[in-house]
Every structure is written in structure tokens, then in C-alpha cells.
């Protein structure tokens, strides 16, 4: 698995585009780094930049971004609504894949040390990178903000982890908080009020830290302390969430600004529902939600499925539709258009040019795909067509499940059919991917024929490559057979238990799946026949025969159930 990390620095400039552009350019200049998002905020005078890549390039880009921010931002002149302590205020490293949080913490500490040694920027290490337990909390590191730095840097207990005395460099650049944490979602909830105090009250209700306990529970009551003389806190309802309330000039209303630090414990939709509940309890309403930066796709998928479940609607619909439900349900497009292609990290990490090649066939129209198949080009051929027939079989079974899930009078069975539809959607996606993979496997064989064969060594290399490519070309249609076979039990269940009016559709689903299976089997056999060494193909051929036998038996059951419905 490729080692990928994300970096989401916050720079203390949200108004001067030339400064923002220069910082982003410094980051993007590092080879292997992809800038995914730049989100400036005028009211907060702060810009959040998101970039990803392998660890070494990302750390280098983070360093260069901090150096450019130090050059262009003078903290002595900075004012904004958001707490801040430096030109580069926070600089977190976040594991995405193939790397642990602990490894990111080590990288963060090394980055902080380098920033001080080479740039003279004082650095605090927070969250997983913290050297002191209390500094796991960013608020502790940033306490007093920029204005408190001279005093903090003179205090041995509060001085930065890397940094000396207050000097000209610190005065200009401030201090940077370098850390490592799991994926964090920053989200703002607009309220139908201009009252900062009421927004703060909602924030206190929901944030994990909660609010200070007061005598009688009143706003002005005496602060309550425990037997040790320490302040008593009333915890909020959302674990791992930090929140404050403030007034935003840009929108002319107050909002609750929240960081969700553990999306497994508190998913985005859970936080949204709780903020809405807390606001309503105080006579307020959430009027719009904005996600700052990016989110993993699963955050929105989980949200969409949550709201579909509340509606007792099938979850077996397209990914695009699930995302649409999530966006509408959480008012993500009330403030401005919300485009998942621009806000979901997985979409932004995709190389569109590479994706266009990999999905060349499935991106075609039905007419275009048929025309391409009919052309004199040998690909797409029977293997791709077999995968597509299998995909259509899975799609038809899914359609019957969705129709049954929403059938009047069957409300109590919606989950039963939704589960079938979800399985069908997954199989359809798998088989559609095999449409292009089968053609890619054929092209791999063709590429081998263009390899040089002038010397004995070249001939041997060419023969070995051709043997490997041919075996791969035999294995791909077997994957098609396996996937299409899984569609048949779904078709059978829908033929037996689904909406009777759609029985014929379940029958066609089975016929299409079996056609895909038998067509793919021919491709397994013809490619296996092209191998010099037939031994590796023996288990493939044996499995293909078993799949055909199982598929034909299931097809008979489906057609029997369908004919029973038709003849009633």
C-alpha cells in the first residue's frame, strides 16, 4: 500500500490573494505533492490549505510553505476572528494510507525542529506529536495567542518545544503549532441569530469540554469548584468535539465553529443532528452548514445512508445519489454550492487523465459502446461484453430490489430489499470495472508482440512477458464469472420474494448474468489455450466449469419462479 499523508496548514492570511498564491505555489513546487484545496476566509483572515502525497515530499512542502509564510506575513499587523499564534498557525500531518499516526508524529517533531533550526520559527508540538501530555490539546499550546508569546517564551514551563528567547524572527512569524492527528473535520453551523452569546451557549452544550459549572446553573452564578479548589466543568454531549460561537461579518449572523477530532466516534451527521437539537432547545435554528477543507468520502456516504435509513428508503442506490442525500440533509449547499468532486479527498486525489484511460469504455454512451464494439478494432471484445452483460444482470436485480423496497404496503420490509440492492450495487460496480480491465488485459498481450526479439535474451524476455500477460488475460474473465455468479442469488430472491410486477425483470437479470458467465468462460478457455505451460491454467478452467454448473442451476430456479408469477 502506498504511504500517503495529508497536511492541512492554516496560514494567518485570508484577504491578500497574492500572499496566499505565493504560499500555495511554494507548496505545489515540490514534486510528488498535490494541492487539493485552498480555502481562504476573509472574516477570519485565515487560509486553510490541504495537500497530500508521500511522507517525504509532504514534509518538504510543509517546510517551504512555512518559510514563504514567514517571508510574507507579519504577525504584528495581523487581525482576524480566529485564534492564532503564528504566520503558519497550525501545521498538522495526518495519516491517509500505509502509515501510522505514530510515524506521522515522528515526522511532525522532525519538521518542528527543522523549522526552528533553519528558519528560527518557534514551534510547539501538539496532539500525537506532543512532548508533554497537556500539549496534546492545541488550545493549551495556543493559549493567549500571538500576543502572549513574549511572556510564554520567557517561562520555562510554557516556552515552545523548539525555540529560544523572544526575538525579531518570533515577533514577525509568531509561533507555529506542529502536530499529528487523525483525520479532523472542521465545520461551521450558521444560526438564525446575531447573538454571539447564544451561539457560544450552543457550542458549550455540545463540545466535549462543556461549560464551567455555576451555582444554581445560572449564567451569573458563582463558579463551582471541587474539594481541590479546581473548576468544575459540565461536559457537553459530543465526545472529541471542540466548538466555539462567534459572529461572522461576512454572513451577518452568528455561527458555531466546530472541530470533530474523531469521526469514528462522532460522525459528521451525528454532530449535525446534535447541534440542531441544541440550537432548537434554545429557540434557534441551523440555517446552513459549511465544511472547511476536505472530508473523506465515507463521511458523506455514512451520512447519506443515515438519512435514507431514517426515511426507510433503500440504500442500494448510486454513490452520487447517496452523496446528494447527505448534502441536502445537512444543508451543505445552503451557503454556497457544494460539489463533492471539489470537497471529497478521494475524488481530488484521482488523476483525471489516468482515470479517463482506465474507464474509457464505461464512460461511453450505450450507443458509443456498441459502435466501438462493432468497429474493426479487436477490443472491446467478448470479455468486456461478458462483463457488461453481468453488470446489467446485477443492475436489473438491484432495480427489482429498489422497487420492492418502496412498494406500497411493504414498508416493514424495506430493509430486507435495501440489503439486496446494496449488494447489487457493489456487484454492478465490480463488473463495470471489469469491462475496462478485460480490454486492458487484451492490450497487454498486444504490447508483448511489439517487444524486440533480435537476440536470444530478447526472445526469452518477450516469451516470458507474453506467457504472463496471457495468464492474466485468462484470470480476468474468471473474475467476471465469480462476480456475475453472485448476482444470481439476488435475482432468485427477487423472483421469489420481490415485487410480482417485476418478476420478468428478475428473470432477465438471471439470463443476462448467465450470458455474461458463459461468455467469460469462453474467454478463460481461449486464453488458457494460448499458454505454453498449461499447468497454471488448470485451476482456472476447473473453477470456470464449476461456476457454469452452479449458474445454470440457479438460472433454472429463477425462471421457474418467474414463470409461476406470470402464469398465475
Report residues per predicted region.
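Amphipathic alpha-helical interface segments
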Residues: 183-185, 438-511, 515, 527
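Long, contiguous binding/interaction regions
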Residues: 1-368, 375, 453, 461, ...
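Conserved phosphate/anionic-ligand binding catalytic regions in large, soluble enzymes, centered on
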Residues: 7-13, 80, 85-92, 373-400, ...
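Amphipathic alpha-helix face/heptad-repeat signature
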Residues: 388-392, 420, 427-434, 473-483, ...
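Amphipathic, well-ordered alpha-helical segments in soluble domains
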Residues: 65, 369, 395-399, 434, ...
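A structural-propensity feature for long, helix-poor, extended segments
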Residues: 406-452, 547-556
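Polytopic transmembrane helical bundles with strong interfacial aromatic enrichment
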Residues: 356-365, 371, 479, 483-486, ...
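Preference for long, well-ordered alpha-helical segments
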Residues: 111, 121-125, 134-137, 487, ...
